[in-house]
Amino acid sequence: MSRSSQRSTIKDMTNGNPAKLILGFAVPMLMGLLFQQFYSMVDTIIVGKFLGVDALASVGSTSAINFMINGFVIGVCTGFSIPVAQRFGAQDYKDMRRFVANAGWIASCFAVIMTVIVCLMTRQILVWMQTPDNIIDGAYSYIFFVFAGIPATYLYNTLAGIIRALGDSKTPVYFLILSSLLNIALDLLFIVQIGTGTAGAAYATVISQAVSGILCLIYMKKKFEILHMHREETRISGRHIYILCKMGVPMGLQYSITAIGSVVIQTAINSLGSIAVASVTAGQKIGMFFCCPFDALGGTMATYAGQNAGAGKVDRIRQGVRSATLIGGIYSIAACIVLTVFGGVIPLLFVDASETVVIHQAHLFLTFNSLFYIPLTIVNVWRFTIQGMGYSLLAILAGVCEMIARAMVGFLLVPIFGYIIICFASPLAWLLADAFLIPAFFYCQKHLLSEKARMD
């Protein structure tokens, strides 16, 4: 690959208009997230339409534990990419390659250990979560094979994170789109044609993610000369592993700690019966689709803040946060209007019109959540910025705030108020996290400025 071609692939986010850079980076990432949610929705639609409401509830009842485990993987891999982005921003390419190599070693070890432990505990976890008896077998069939595919999740997210750390947010999207289409085709094959039940949805997800990870690996080897390593750069390094774990593990724990609250909520939902589970499943699938822009802005700000922190450009980080928050705020208003008006129609994608209770409850869930999308914007933009700046512990504490809010709702309020309070669990979590993140960001900014002044 020529130097000019490589420069066109890699994006330096330490120079240029912050708003344009953020939009230019976030839009391709958004396309990938939308396709990811699209095939996730297709999974749910096929399960709901072809296998019925109980099967829909079976898959939905695993969403919180799935988020906790796979969220840890995604968080760890995102954290691994931050030292890569910082070294790239500092133009220290040799050290950057050491981080890339050691990220591969750690990801491989984590993948093997997690797969064994989680697969052995899957059934018991579902029992602890009070999964209804009529759906627990379908839930187990689905989530066991999803967890067996944890290595594929590590493969894709580690490599995609490294590619994005170098400023290329488009290529992982292309591979994700391809894997999304493959996932849909495999869903139809396994569920409709072969009749593998809920396990078929898991087969499709794991295979398609493995394909996208392999494509990322091939692309990196062929297209990034800057990542071509000498033998000594591939060796395990205690210093690099420490830094990677210092960034990755806290970010993974951030996801998992947040998800613990979701597990408590899911347990509370399970106690309300399969109709409530199906309602929240439909609402969450739709809501996750509409929340993709917030995730894209967050992922963008991790790279943006990482590169600019590495380059010592603290003022640009503040400008980027302002721009990203404004973009997210404008979108939040539009999304709220759409979900309030049409939230009673979209659930028909997942269930028959005769399931009036499911449709009504899903609409309530979407409406109340969308009213708080501006606080969600702050959670994603400001937390990922703090993470990119290198303050991983503070990002974890924000996750603790979310966990506390959701746990309080699940343990204390659901037994009293029932389904309606489920609709406010996430909004309360976002508000409590914001109360922590806003002052935390200004602390991080002040600390970085003082560090920069001391070094100068």
Question: Can you describe what each PLM-predicted range is?
Answer:
Residues 68-71, 115, 183-187, 213-217, ...:
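Hydrophobic transmembrane alpha-helices of multi-pass small-molecule transporters
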Residues 77, 145-164, 172-180, 201-214, ...:
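Short runs within selected transmembrane alpha-helices of multi-pass transporters and secretion channels
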Residues 56-116, 153-172, 279-343, 376-398:
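Small-residue-rich hydrophobic transmembrane alpha-helices
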Residues 15, 19-38, 42, 65, ...:
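Residue-level signal for short hydrophobic patches within transmembrane helices
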Residues 1-26, 84-149, 193-249, 305-372, ...:
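Short alpha-helical transmembrane segments in multi-pass integral membrane proteins
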